[in-house]
């Protein structure tokens, strides 16, 4: 079931280690989406507004939307949509142009409560290594980001491609970095 299901048959099934662990990861992901500075600012606003109150997840998310101006409707699916998202990753290296195309597909298999699922926002920390284990500086095509050894990919659709330039040999991907 989801972290915050719409209904449940037994309250003891609601408070499981999975719910707590997934809930913690969702909050960590929110801090990455919002950015550390805005995250801490939003948490302070949250306590100013709701200290001592019984609140809902909707209250929590609304504070972040209000304080950052970001629409978090799709992010809210992490609280309400059940199931386990699966990812398929493929790469195409173009040695002529020293480019790597990384393709990621998201699958959200049907569950007993919903046959059709919406894509979830997913963050993937990526690095690329050569065959000696040396990290490539990552430079994304059409991006103003400075080159770094690790890149945070924000996926918000079912299928997304990322192109990295200045890659002179087929790399080994290092996905899901902490």
Which sequence ranges carry the predicted segments?
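Non-catalytic accessory/interaction domains
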Residues: 3-6, 18, 23-26, 37-40, ...
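Glycine- and acidic
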Residues: 8-13, 43-46
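Acidic, glycine-rich low-complexity/disordered segments
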Residues: 31-36
